[in-house]
């Protein structure tokens, strides 16, 4: 349910052809993979099959003979054959590697390299490497990237910082999805905001007032799933008037594993604000309490957000609210003594741009009769300003009255392509 999928956008190439050090990093990156996951073997075979292309081979080997790439430069044929073999190996082990962040990073790295070198998906593959001594350079002293530092690990593998997504839920609740759709929802009871291989977030809502369609989030449950070498599974639960600065087990980090400090919880305003940092999956979460409701805001790495199966498709952060659960602004029912003009004036003080956040503020103030709802919308906008990688998408505007709010630009997000790729390897 939710918004229909959008066409994947092609990735832009970036960086220079991979060096031996970069290829070795592919091997090092996956050193923490689960024992049944064979991504370590896939990386070792790829590094081995490309050694002759890294300056030590003959000119014939560099040219690769046999057209692996379309218009590629020196070595493109041999490199394309190696990349196709690498991709085939990852597909064969995909089922046992599901949920392994290193595996997903390697899959996207292959895609990037194939695009950079104009490699076709169909064609000859590299012969299996001969069994023999350890790979040259495997023990060269190059430090392995920290498996619990997602941003650092990704940057070393891809030569660029990772992409991030933002989602928020506040007020009525209003949900801003990863794809910049903005919905006002009537969802009642427990609904998943996120449900992927690394993170589960559930919001529980109840009506703002007796007989009202609009609801407000009264409880948030967040599960950080067990990740080898980094964290034990941790559960955080917040309710109105109970915003703890600790996980359910009383801890404030990811546990006693080597990367336990890569998950932490802190506050700058006890009882009203909690921030959870999950560096091992490139994620920051902010939870606030305002006007008797809870607000949720997240910045999360693209690969993490899109690591889910078809059975996990109901996620408000991914598809927005299901059509049957959406409210239009025309459905508001004023409660209390606040007029529309007063509500607009109150919201305008902190939200000068009449965008989705402004209209959500007016909606909430009118339907609740509580001026404190202005704070929830203002905080959500500030989180978006801090979390969005592209500030041109900060302000979203209604397409017309009575229709759910959507992005003014209506650009197809690149993330659809990542999602399609994930489905293809299952």
Swiss-Prot record:
Leader sequence residues: 1-35
Chain positions with Phosphotyrosine modification: 46
Subcellular localization, as worded in the UniProt entry: Cell membrane
This protein's encoding gene: HJV
Post-translational changes noted in the entry: Autocatalytically cleaved at low pH; the two chains remain linked via two disulfide bonds. Also proteolytically processed by TMPRSS6, several fragments being released in the extracellular space; regulates HJV activity in BMP signaling and thefore iron homeostasis.
GO CC annotations, alphabetized: BMP receptor complex; cell surface; extracellular space; HFE-transferrin receptor complex; plasma membrane; plasma membrane protein complex; side of membrane
Disulphide linkage map: 148-230, 167-317
Function of the molecule: Acts as a bone morphogenetic protein (BMP) coreceptor. Through enhancement of BMP signaling regulates hepcidin (HAMP) expression and regulates iron homeostasis.
Coiled coil: none
Residue(s) at site: Cleavage: 172-173
Keywords for this protein: Autocatalytic cleavage, Cell membrane, Disease variant, Disulfide bond, Glycoprotein, GPI-anchor, Lipoprotein, Membrane, Phosphoprotein, Signal
Glycosylation site list: 118, 213, 372
Pfam families registered for this protein in UniProt: RGM_C, RGM_N
PANTHER family: HEMOJUVELIN, RGM DOMAIN FAMILY MEMBER DRAG-1
GO terms under biological process: activin receptor signaling pathway; BMP signaling pathway; cellular response to BMP stimulus; intracellular iron ion homeostasis; multicellular organismal-level iron ion homeostasis; negative regulation of BMP signaling pathway; negative regulation of transcription by RNA polymerase II; positive regulation of transcription by RNA polymerase II
Recorded topology in the membrane: Lipid-anchor; GPI-anchor
Lipid attachment residues per UniProt (GPI-anchor amidated aspartate): 400
Family to which this protein belongs: Belongs to the repulsive guidance molecule (RGM) family.
Alphabetized Gene3D superfamilies for the sequence: Mog1/PsbP, alpha/beta/alpha sandwich
Disorder cited: Hemochromatosis 2A: A juvenile form of hemochromatosis, a disorder of iron metabolism with excess deposition of iron in a variety of organs leading to their failure, bronze skin pigmentation, hepatic cirrhosis, arthropathy and diabetes. The most common symptoms of juvenile hemochromatosis at presentation are hypogonadism and cardiomyopathy.
Tissue specificity comment: Adult and fetal liver, heart, and skeletal muscle.
Region called Disordered, residue ranges: 119-142
The protein, known as: Hemojuvelin
GO molecular function: BMP binding; coreceptor activity; signaling receptor binding; transferrin receptor binding
Assembly information from the UniProt record: Interacts with BMP2 and BMP4. Interacts with BMP6. Interacts with BMPR1B. Interacts with TMPRSS6.
């Amino acid at each position: 349910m939710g918004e229909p999928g959008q066409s994947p956008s092609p990735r832009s190439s970036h960086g220079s052809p991979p060096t031996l050090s970069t290829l070795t990093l592919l091997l090092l990156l996956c050193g923490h993979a689960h024992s049944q996951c064979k991504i370590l073997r896939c990386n070792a075979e790829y590094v081995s099959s490309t050694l002759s292309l890294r300056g030590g081979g003959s000119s014939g080997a560099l040219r690769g003979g046999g057209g692996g790439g379309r218009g590629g430069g020196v070595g493109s044929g041999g490199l394309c054959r190696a990349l196709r073999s690498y991709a085939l190996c990852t597909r064969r082990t995909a089922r046992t590697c599901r949920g392994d962040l290193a595996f997903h990073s390697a899959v996207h790295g292959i895609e990037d390299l194939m695009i950079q070198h104009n490699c076709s998906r169909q064609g000859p593959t590299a012969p299996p490497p001969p069994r023999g001594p350890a790979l040259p350079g495997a023990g060269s002293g190059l430090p392995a990237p920290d498996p619990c530092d997602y941003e650092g690990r990704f940057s070393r593998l891809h030569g660029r910082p990772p992409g991030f997504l933002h989602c928020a839920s506040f007020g009525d609740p209003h949900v801003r999805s990863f794809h910049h759709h903005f919905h006002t929802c009537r969802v009642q009871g427990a609904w998943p905001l996120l449900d992927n291989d690394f993170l589960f977030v559930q919001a529980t809502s109840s009506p703002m007032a007796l007989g009202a369609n609009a609801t407000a989030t009264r409880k948030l449950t967040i599960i950080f799933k067990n990740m080898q070498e980094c964290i034990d599974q941790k559960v955080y639960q917040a309710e109105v008037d109970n915003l703890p600065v600790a996980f359910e087990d009383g801890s404030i980090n990811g546990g006693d594993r080597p990367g336990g400090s890569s998950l932490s919880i802190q506050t700058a305003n006890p009882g009203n604000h909690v921030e959870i940092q999950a560096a091992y999956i490139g994620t920051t979460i902010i939870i606030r309490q305002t006007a008797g409701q809870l607000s949720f805001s997240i910045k999360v790495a693209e690969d993490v957000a899109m690591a889910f199966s078809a059975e996990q498709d109901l996620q408000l952060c991914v598809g927005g609210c299901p059509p049957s659960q959406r409210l239009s602004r025309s459905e508001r029912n004023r409660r209390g003594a606040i007029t529309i003009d007063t509500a607009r004036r109150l919201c305008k003080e902190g939200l000068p741009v009449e965008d989705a956040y402004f209209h959500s503020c007016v909606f909430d103030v009118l339907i609740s009769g509580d001026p404190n709802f202005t704070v929830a919308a203002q905080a959500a906008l500030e989180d978006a300003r801090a979390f969005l990688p592209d500030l041109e998408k900060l302000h979203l505007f209604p397409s017309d009255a009575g229709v759910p709010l959507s992005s003014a630009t209506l650009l197809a997000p690149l993330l659809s392509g990542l999602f399609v790729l994930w489905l293809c390897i299952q």
